[in-house]
Amino acid sequence: MRLRELIFGAIAVALLAGYAVLGGRVAPFVAPGAAATPRPARPVSAVPAPMVNGTIAFILRGDVFVLRNGQYTDRTTEGRSVQPALSADGATLYFARVEQIDGLRRTDGAVVNAQLGFSNIVRKPAGGGAEEILLKGLVAPAPNRFHDVMWLLAPSISPDGKRMAVIEGDDDGSADLVVFDLATKKPNVLSNRGDWADPSWSPDGTTLVVTSYDRGEPQLLLKPVDNRPAVLIKGIPEGEPYRASYSPDGKWLVYTLRHDDGRRNDVHAIEISSGKDIALTSDGTSWNGIFSPDGRQIAYLHADGFTIDLWVRDLGGALSDGGLGPPLKITRGEGIDGASRPAWGR
């Protein structure tokens, strides 16, 4: 999803506290059901859920929820959080939080009042506890109200927990990939006036897979963190691929394929070395897939009408031409944010 769509999606979550219709060019299309179904209330206490291994973080009505030990519960309550990430051990939670400040901007030669949007990257224990703002999108508050702000989105934590990749959005419309050393906060900029999104680390910590819109239509790129040239993933079926992440063994990517009709999305996996591509869903209303830490399952979002839920499915022998296990519904229709990919840690 491009920067402006990420921003609009973040603002929609913050202001509407729900998923509604995701209007982005590569956002999933969700068709209305035969009849409207009342949505359950936002959970205010732990919700029983099927047992899955590890910890899964997801966004529900603008807040981060964490699934572990057979229940999910909120870790934020302000309704402005998007795009969760987890450390590999599942112990630490990261996410972007949307903020705004009264300011001024020059428009067509005139100075006008403006609500300036930005986002911070926040860290806190996955089990609950105090928050820490790691990166601030309010770069330079100014007494004259011409504040310097930026969007910091899509955090992704390296396997060793020492680095964090983010997408940094600037006023010129660029969306660049930046890796921060978490100890020193020193940035390593890996693109220049790019149009990138959705970073995710390789298991060995040497490469990030991103969605690139540099040529208009989305492409999946493998970008080495030592800043060697990016490599294009080939073998993608007809359609628009986006939001990929690695398998634990580093051999596969799971990603979403938006079909040519512009209305349907499905979860696919592609073998990096061979280009072998496998459809893991075929219903046209599933997206945002991720591998489990042991590589035996995927978690993904699935829509039934306007209701989006988190599902988990055993891969079985699907990556070796076998069959998938049955899907397992995790949430209860409370309002999953369809623009935010879930995260899964041990």
Task: Identify the meaning behind each predicted range.
Residues 2-346:
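Sequence signature of WD/YWTD-type beta-propeller architectures
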